[in-house]
């Protein structure tokens, strides 16, 4: 539910901006990144991004974002500096994960197989890899997609592994809610500004059940923003 709230709100921003809907979640993340973080139109920490998945390039960008700070994601943040460090640390891990995911796809491609190699040690293989990685940026929606996979398919396995893991998950759901509400507030503010107050009021005043969640609100925003933009 958390992820689909983030996804729907991000998709609503894209729909409000240009009226488009993407075919898949990665397409939505790419469109959102190009139109918002890449142009400086989102608030921190949702603005954090790297512009390339070439390892040498994104590591240079990460060093600038770290500003000399380091942070362990197993340690609970206690202040702004810690929180900034945690966001940057997760971005770094996400960049490495998306790089690996892209490389795995390259290895299965016809172009790679034509090189008659099994890894990226040759110059030709590295050039093919980097040509695919250089144009791939990464920002918050990509990280949310990765987090959804981790939460659904991996981290749940460790929930019963004793007091240590349970203590690390204190306030977990509350923290997820804070992130979703913050992202939804930003998305709603953009949609209101982009579509105009009269259309925004129609969206925000739409009758909804009292138990309606932030994720459901994001889904309605996505649907209405696309419809409103297509009429304008």
Walk through the language-model features, giving the residues of each.
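Terminal alpha-helical segments
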Residues: 1-232
């Amino acid at each position: 539910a958390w992820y689909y709230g983030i996804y729907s709100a991000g998709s609503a921003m894209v729909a409000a901006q240009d009226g488009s809907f993407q075919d898949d979640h990665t397409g939505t993340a790419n469109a959102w990144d190009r139109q918002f973080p890449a142009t400086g139109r989102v608030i921190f920490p949702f603005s954090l991004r790297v512009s390339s998945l070439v390892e040498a390039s994104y590591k240079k960008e990460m060093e600038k974002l770290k500003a000399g700070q380091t942070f362990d994601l197993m340690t609970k943040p206690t202040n702004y500096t810690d929180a900034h460090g945690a966001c940057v640390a997760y971005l770094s891990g996400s960049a490495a994960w998306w790089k690996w995911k892209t490389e795995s796809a390259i290895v299965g491609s016809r172009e790679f197989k034509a090189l008659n190699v099994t890894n990226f040690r040759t110059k030709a293989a590295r050039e093919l890899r980097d040509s695919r990685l250089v144009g791939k940026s990464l920002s918050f929606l990509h990280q949310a997609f990765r987090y959804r996979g981790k939460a659904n398919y991996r981290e749940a396995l460790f929930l019963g592994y004793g007091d240590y893991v349970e203590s690390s998950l204190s306030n977990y759901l509350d923290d997820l809610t804070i992130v979703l509400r913050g992202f939804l507030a930003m998305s709603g503010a953009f949609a209101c500004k982009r579509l105009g107050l009269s259309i925004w009021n129609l969206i925000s005043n739409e009758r909804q059940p009292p138990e309606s969640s932030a994720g459901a609100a994001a889904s309605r925003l996505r649907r209405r923003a696309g419809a409103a933009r297509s009429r304008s």
